[in-house]
Every structure is written in structure tokens, then in C-alpha cells.
Amino acid sequence: MDLAVRKMTLEGLGVSQLGAVHENLPPARLVEASVRRREGMLAENGALVCLTGKRTGRSPKDRFIVENGLTRGPVDWGPVNKPFPGERFERLLAKASAYLENLEEVYVVDAYAGADPRYRLNVQVVCEYAWQALFTRQLFRRPSREELDAFEPDWTVISVPGLLTDPEEDGTESETFVGIDFGRRVVLICGTRYAGEIKKSIFSVLNFVLPTEHGVFPMHCSANVGPGGDVALFFGLSGTGKTTLSSDPERYLIGDDEHGWSDEGIFNFEGGCYAKCIDLSREKEPQIYDAIRFGAVLENVVVDRITRRVDYSDASLTENTRAAYPLEYIEGAVDSGRAGHPAAVLFLTADAFGVLPPISVLSPEQAAYYFLSGYTAKLAGTEADMEADVEATFSACFGAPFLPLPATTYAAMLSEKLREHGSRCYLINTGWSGGPYGVGERVDIAATRQMVRAVIAGNIDESKTYTDPFFGLQVPLEVPGVPSGILNPRETWADRAAYDDQAAKLADLFRENFKKFEDGVPEGVRKAGPNV
């Protein structure tokens, strides 16, 4: 970016008189700076290991959207999208500016959010920490040198983990603050080193801008494409297997977390992956394992300080250990980040109750119902301040924490896309079988991969099915390469009466949760849920 443009954009946010500003450094120099500044250390595999302190996940209670004329009407205000007064945000921004001006060094990354030039955002990220600049460089899409010369930011993200907010003085919930101002086009992140806040804040921005300004459907999903051009989408919350299942050596990865679906096809918002790596092994997830090398960031992963060997099984810091790396580290990843319309759409859920079938075929109405329901399990450590190890939860559209607009807006966009392009839809349970969490076992990843391959190949559509008596789902009687005994969840429980009781309880939870959507959906969708 031209220095005059940089100066003008930052001064427009009240930021001036900075110390040394390091712009768009390559990974090696950012790693070097991180080690020099003692922000992290190198592991034996070459990755940079950084710790985030007590905030080892997102801080949803501390996320706000500035209420103004642009957001007052369309935003779905509530516990997820909490309003924040513009004048208070101005004061916090001034605090952040003063804080930045007192730092000896600041790291700035210019990047794209969105692989399709028609819809992408130019994002300028200003970081207190060099390792967060490395994270940003590897996770966002990287402009060429020529593009950087002409780069002008649409949005600015300011990440100052060392600035702790004061609830009494600043009107925040805690010392942490994540605020989005759609008027000034700025994101302010204070009091947390968890780097996922940077990427998810811009995801929230895209989830507002793309539907309202471009008619593009934003999705919390991973995506891959086969040699024949057949595209598959994988929806699901953190820990349900989006990254794992879309990283298939027989297919080409488009992206692991955030995509848009336009009239021309799908496109990745990002240029990298942010994979959970608790219990990671080369045997189970070879692509992810091999992508963790020099230039990658390991977040809250335990490392032996003497040997520098990584222990992916150690959850003493958090279950939410993460690896951030660029897509180019995945062999066969789609460089363009773009592909055609999806043939198969998969909803992933980690069912903590252990009662949902491992695979179900969804009608268009059921697709809308289960998309709006967004049922999964909130696994330990994917958010800060969690009280239970596992908590069953409903997160609309498999991404409620990141959706500024009403959930029914996104569901209507999905239904329209499925109708227009004839995409098939499935529900995949990557959670528990044979009992609830703590009693049953997690569905084997190898079996889940076989189910996914059968779905993509179209083999499921030719299989005979039975109707699940509790949820009305069509469940295949057989799937190639998968033991038929696990396809009927009731048969995997030693105590069938206990299964019936647990299934009825979950069905009740679905019905209770869906009441808030009933007035905003067609009758067919209202009737597509559990039938007991």
C-alpha cells in the first residue's frame, strides 16, 4: 500500500505517530520477529508455537455490533448481536489508538477476504503481536506484489490484546472487547490473544455485507471438489469435522471454514486453514499433519521445551488447540479458491446424546429445518468461559455466533440455491454412537469418511432406506464400506429403552428450539422436524 494511503486510512481512525510499522512482512521475518520478541517458540516440526493465555477460545459474551442507521433495522439484535453505542466505540477506538502509539513496533498485513474479485473485501489488519500478523497473513488471501502497490483497504481490523477494557468506564462486559462498526468499517479487538477473533470478525462482516449488498449466500462450511468438478459442502460448528472431512487426498480442497455461494458458483473467503489439532495424527489426518511446518502457527499446543516435540494429545492448556497454515501447504488445494455449484451439501453434527443416525438423507424441507436448527455439541474449549465438558446446543445455520442477520434470511437463501441447482442434502452425525458422551464412543472417522464418499459418489441415493421413528429421517440400510450395524443408532445401545428415552428428549429439544422460527418459514419446513 502507498505510504500516504496507509497514513490517511489510519489517521481517519485516529491512529498516528506510530513507532516502527512493519508492513506485509514475509513469513520468515514474522517468525523471526515473534521469536525475537518472545511471543512464541519454534517446534521441532518448524511451526511457531504461541500461547493465548486464559482466553483459549472466542469470547462470544464480549462481542458487539455498533448500533447506527446502517445496522439498526437489518441486524438480528439479541444475545449474539449485542448493540454497542457509537460514542462508546469512539472512545474505545481512541484508547486503542493511544495504546498503539505507545508501542515500539506495530505489524500491519494487507489481505483479501474473498476469492471472487467481484465480492472480496480489502482488509488492513493492524497487530500488536508479530505472531498474529503471521496468523493473518496465512489465513487471509494474499495479494500479489503488484496488487499490494495499489491496495486500498475497505475494512480495518485493530488487534491490541494488551489493552484491557474497563467495564465501568468503557461499558464492556469484561476486560475483553470485540466490536464491529459497519459505519466506520472497523473491527476493534482488545484484551484477548486468541487469533480466531480476527478471522471470525471479518467472517461476521461478510455475513452482513454479501447478502445485503450482493445477494451472495455466505456459509460457515468447508468445501472440496473432485477431479470431475463435483463440489461438496460441509456445514458444521467447530469440532464437527469440517476441516477433517474436507481434507481428502482423493479430492481437491477449496477451503475449510468460510465460503460464499453466488450465481456463478462457490468461492472461499480465506487463503488458509484453522484446524483443530487435539489428538492429531498422521494416520487419521495426513493432510493436516503434514501441513504443520515452518510458516504455520500452532496455538495453545503443548510442546516439550527441551526437545521442542509437539504433543497433540495434551489438552492441559485447552481442548481447543489449533493450527493455522496457508492453503498452499495442502497438496492439491484449489489455488483459485473457486468452483462450480455444489452437487452435495452435508450438515455435520456432533450429537452428544448419541441418538441421531450417522447418516440421513434430507428432503428440501428437512434441509431447511435442520439448517435452521443447527444442532451439534459445544465441545470443551471452543469458547471461553464454558462450564461443562460438552453441552448440547442449537446454533442456527451452523454458525449463529457469526450471523448478524436473522437466521431465516440465510435459510431462505439456502433453499433457493438448493432449488436452483438441484443440490442433494444430507445430515452426518460425527458425534457419539452406542450411548451418550461419556458412555458411547465417537463415530469412527474412517467410517464417516466412507459415508461421505458414498454421498459424493451418489451411491446413497440408490440405497434402500428406513424412516427413523423419532426424527422422520430417511436412513440408508447399507453404505459401501460401512458396518451396517452402526447405521441404526438404536441397535448400538445396550439399553434400548434408554435410547428411546434419550431420543424423545432430543426430539423435544428440537421442537422447543424451532418455535422461534415457526412464523418465518413455510408450513412444509415447520412440519419437517421430529414427529414424536
Swiss-Prot record:
Keyword Oxidoreductase: no
GO cellular component terms given for this protein: cytosol
Cofactor binding, per record: Binds 1 Mn(2+) ion per subunit.
Highest taxon in the source lineage: Bacteria
Major place of residence: cytoplasm
Entry's EC annotation: 4.1.1.49
Group of enzyme by EC: lyase
Binding-site residues, Mn(2+): K200, H220, D257
MF GO annotations: ATP binding; metal ion binding; phosphoenolpyruvate carboxykinase (ATP) activity
Catalyzed reaction equations: oxaloacetate + ATP = phosphoenolpyruvate + ADP + CO2
SUPFAM superfamilies for the chain: PEP carboxykinase N-terminal domain, PEP carboxykinase-like
Subcellular location: Cytoplasm
Record bears the keyword ATP-binding: yes
Cofactor(s) needed by this chain: Mn(2+)
Binding locations of ATP: 200, 220, 236-244, 285, 322, 442-443, 448
UniProt-annotated binding residues for substrate: R58, Y194, K200, R322
General function of this protein: Involved in the gluconeogenesis. Catalyzes the conversion of oxaloacetate (OAA) to phosphoenolpyruvate (PEP) through direct phosphoryl transfer between the nucleoside triphosphate and OAA.
PANTHER family noted in UniProt: PHOSPHOENOLPYRUVATE CARBOXYKINASE (ATP), PHOSPHOENOLPYRUVATE CARBOXYKINASE ATP
Family statement: Belongs to the phosphoenolpyruvate carboxykinase (ATP) family.
Name the UniProt record assigns to this protein: Phosphoenolpyruvate carboxykinase (ATP)
Source species taxonomy: Bacteria, Bacillati, Actinomycetota, Rubrobacteria, Rubrobacterales
